[in-house]
Amino acid sequence: VHQRIGFVVGAVTFSMSVLASPTLAAPSTLVGSDHEPIEVQRVQQGTATPPQQTAPTRPLIAVAHRGAAGTAPENTLAAIDEGHRLGAETVEIDVQLTSDEEIVLMHDTTLERTTDVTEVFPDRAPYDVGDFTLEEIERLDAGSAFDQEFAGEPVPTLREALDRLQEHEMNLLLEVKEPSLYPGIEHQISVELARSPYWLVPNAPDEPHRLVVQSFDWESTEHSKSLLPSVPHGLLGQVPKDRIADYDWAQMINPDHESIDADYVAAVQSAGLEIMPYTINEADGMWHVLEMGVDGFITDFPETGQRAIAEFLEGRADLAADEESEGSEESVELAS
């Protein structure tokens, strides 16, 4: 049973001591739908995490990569809106820290590729994210590099993204980029999430995860899990099959889609973890991993992904119906 950060469902009160201390919350009581109190434990850095649980059966999902990076500027509110418009239930975004320790959405560790930073700050090479304040980054245009239609689109903060996602009732796959460059970013993220307890309440077992935190830095991911034990965490990259059991604190492994096969998918799932490979933009590739048995996949084109999943499920249902029909015919023949 996962612990949760202290808040009260319904009234949504939260101990704001989280904002000033590594301790994320004082002990408090959750009130369930049946009004029975549920004790909530103190969550501290280094708290032991609960044992791995068997992965529930959740619907297949196509995660909108960096928003919907195929049709809107990545890691912007416009991309989140586009993902929502295209029917995505879950969005993946990347976060890093500014020099004044504000959390912003950005994939690359430099600002050059996706913004006009070289024009606004021509003497600030190499344009590392961590060398700029939030106020400076807010002056940048993160849309024009993708298309002039999005000129003036700003680099959003994590808080702005969380608000927009909640407004759309969307789920979040949150990637922590290069955490070794930003000591303490795991705690900064946990503090930001604590401002909106909505993100700390897991969805039902038959629904997509409301929030998953992931990174290629597995030590950072484990530390984040100790801070946010109620939140599922994922390992980006391919964990060797003989080491999957070592990561019993994780709930997900998300590798490059070209690095896996059906045996690897089965190994991950037999350990009670889910698997959602990245980044697949062609329908054939989506079908390929769906046939392996994955729990979902990450794509720049969520509309294509949703269509592939729908067609895959329809085909599987038709196959099951045919097999059931054949079985019924055989039973009739045997009876006669």
What are these regions (language model features)?
Residues 2-11, 15-18, 22-336:
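Phosphate-group recognition and catalysis centered on beta-loop-alpha active-site segments
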